[in-house]
């Protein structure tokens, strides 16, 4: 699991 990918996905969702 890559936390960085999750962060980028969340930021993209914003």
Curated annotation (Swiss-Prot):
<keyword id="KW-0964">Secreted</keyword>
<comment type="similarity">
    <text>Belongs to the MCD family. Mastoparan subfamily.</text>
</comment>
<feature type="modified residue" description="Leucine amide">
    <location>
        <position position="14"/>
    </location>
</feature>
<keyword id="KW-1052">Target cell membrane</keyword>
<comment type="function">
    <text>Antimicrobial peptide with activity against Gram-negative and Gram-positive bacteria, as well as against fungi. Has potent hemolytic activity against erythrocytes.</text>
</comment>
<keyword id="KW-1053">Target membrane</keyword>
<keyword id="KW-0027">Amidation</keyword>
<dbReference type="GO" id="GO:0016020">
    <property type="term" value="C:membrane"/>
</dbReference>
<dbReference type="GO" id="GO:0044218">
    <property type="term" value="C:other organism cell membrane"/>
</dbReference>
<keyword id="KW-0472">Membrane</keyword>
<protein>
    <recommendedName>
        <fullName>Eumenine mastoparan-EM4</fullName>
    </recommendedName>
</protein>
<dbReference type="GO" id="GO:0005576">
    <property type="term" value="C:extracellular region"/>
</dbReference>
């Amino acid at each position: 699991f890559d936390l960085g990918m999750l962060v980028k996905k969340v930021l993209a969702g914003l």
